[in-house]
Amino acid sequence: LRQIIEFLNTKDLHFKVLNRLNPKDYGSRKQVLIYEGIDLNSNFWLIFVYSSKSRFIQKNSSEIMELSDRIIKQMGHNYKIKALFISSPLCSKAHSHLNISQWRVFNDFV
C-alpha cells in the first residue's frame, strides 16, 4: 500500500480514503490488487494494480473491465474514475480499448 501511495503522490493524485478490496470477493482469481478511494475533490476512484512479466493484451483489458462491472454491481455504486496501473508492457489495442471506455492507464508503475 505504501508503494502505491508514493506512486500516486508522484502523479499528484492525493486521496482522503484508500481501501483495498479483495478480488476473490468478486469472483476473480487474477493476481490483481484492487483499491477504491476518494480523492481530495470527492471523486470516487476504482484502482487496479496489475503486475506481470508478460504483455498486457486486449483479453486482459476485457477481464479487468468485467471485474470492474461486477464490483460496481455488488457495491451498488458507480465510480467516476477508473484507473489501471501496469508494470508490464501494454498492447496498443488494449490501451485503445481502455481509453475508449474512459479508463486512465498508467504504464510506468514499478
Residue ranges, per PLM feature:
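Detector for Asparagine
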Residues: N9, N19-N22, N41-N43, N60, ...
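Acidic-basic catalytic patches of nuclease active cores, encompassing PD-(D/E)XK
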Residues: L1-I34
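Phenylalanine-focused residue identity feature
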Residues: F7, F15, F44, F48, ...
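Short, compact, well-ordered microdomains
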Residues: H77-V110
